[in-house]
Design a protein with these regions (language model features):
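Catalytic core of pol beta-like nucleotidyltransferases
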Residues: 1-18, 22, 34-40, 51-222
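Short, glycine- and small/hydrophobic-rich beta-strand elements in well-ordered beta-sheets
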Residues: 22-30
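N-terminal loops that bind phosphate or other acidic moieties
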Residues: 43-45
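Short glycine-rich or small-residue beta-strand-to-loop segments that form or flank ligand, phosphate
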Residues: 47-49
Length: 222
């Protein structure tokens, strides 16, 4: 049977409302399904923020998810309201822009984010990519790890485009024209690597060098 994200979210929302009633502060969807880029391997990134989230709430939520179809695909985010309002702002920038609201609003979170938080998101993203790229070249030499780093770079490129242009776009194809030429090269590789199952050692070296140089530039520039 064909999977319908709309039908799944309707069932999910109904079950969450039965479980938590008026304790729901926000419910939404993010990730590849939210961006319209999902494939058969994509996770379901549901977002739920409660008035407060105890361990009992977390366990009850997990048990509720066990009753839903496609349980193995469910990922996402669960927290209490006070925690998300006190969250690292550089994380919240993309969290807010990447999440489709179904119940509630993230406007209160967005109000606390400024340009310095976006620059910090870029710097942290570039630093993490740089560190793991070096680690992979020295120790792992793993193609899947490198592909994951390019995926992370794609999120950093979203922040870069927003910082430079004021426009936020979820889809990579729409993001491309917002970027400078050197950043476009990295994003094109992000898209290409999604279609490649394996990499030769020569490709691993080539793509690692490209990513390392890109991350280095942004660490120093921003």
């Amino acid at each position: 049977m064909t999977f319908s994200m709309d039908e799944w979210m309707k069932q999910y929302t109904c079950e969450v409302q039965k479980l938590f009633h008026d304790r729901i502060w926000f419910l939404g969807l993010q990730g590849s399904y939210g961006r319209g880029e999902a494939n058969e391997h994509s996770d379901i990134d549901a977002v739920l923020i409660l008035d407060a989230a105890s361990v009992d709430d977390v366990n009850a939520y997990s048990q509720m998810l066990d009753t839903l179809p496609n349980r193995e695909k469910v990922c996402g985010f669960l927290s209490g309201k006070k925690e998300i309002l006190s969250w690292e702002p550089s994380d919240l920038f993309q969290f807010c822009y990447d999440t489709i609201p179904i119940l509630g609003s993230l406007d209160e979170l967005m109000a606390g984010i400024d340009e310095s938080d976006i620059r910090r998101a870029i710097r942290i993203g570039a630093c993490n990519v740089y560190h793991m790229c070096v680690h992979n070249l020295v120790h792992e030499k793993n193609a899947d790890l490198l592909k994951g780093l390019y995926k992370s770079a794609g999120f950093t490129l979203q922040a870069i485009a927003f910082w430079q242009t004021g426009s936020y776009t979820k889809k990579k194809t729409d993001l491309l024209p917002l970027l400078r030429e050197d950043d476009q090269v990295v994003l094109k590789t992000v898209i290409q690597l999604k279609e490649k199952e394996t990499l030769s050692m020569e490709e691993l070296q080539k793509y690692s060098e490209q990513l390392l140089n890109w991350a280095s530039k942004w660490i120093c520039e921003v």
